Amino acid sequence: SIFGNIKRRVEEGRWEPNGGSWIEPDCNIPSGESLTRHFLYGQSFLKEELDYRADQFWMPDVFGYSASIPQILKLCGISGFLTTKLSWNEENRFPYDTFLWSGIDGTQVLTHFNTSHCWPDPETLVAQTMDIQHKDIQDTRLCSFGYGDGGGGPLTEMLEAAPYLK
């Protein structure tokens, strides 16, 4: 089964589960209780099925962020946050790639904002590397490739190109 193959890859250290929440939740309207339960159920599933506990929250495709997220993440044992949607602004460029996000109670969580999706070709990778805003603290960028909206994942061409880009 596909899930059986994933379990084997996790055991081999070749697949790192991420996220820690049950699904990628809406973060504009739900209460803190709702967000906390996403982590309770998500982390429980990862522990029961994969003997794994996520310490990074990967939330690439939401349209808003509750100011309580840093506090909720820390209380749920999550120490880092990765997102992409802050780049969907044509007027104001967000000034940071990597930063400490302070929640409404002052709790901070290390946050990385990946500014774009990636087609794994040399031109795109060079352009994205040149676009890193704070090279003194970050000199590489995650290349999250594939098509996420509506599913689909990476194209065959993307997977075939990846080994040549090391």
Feature roles, as predicted:
Residues 1-166:
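Catalytic-domain carbohydrate-binding cleft regions of carbohydrate-active enzymes
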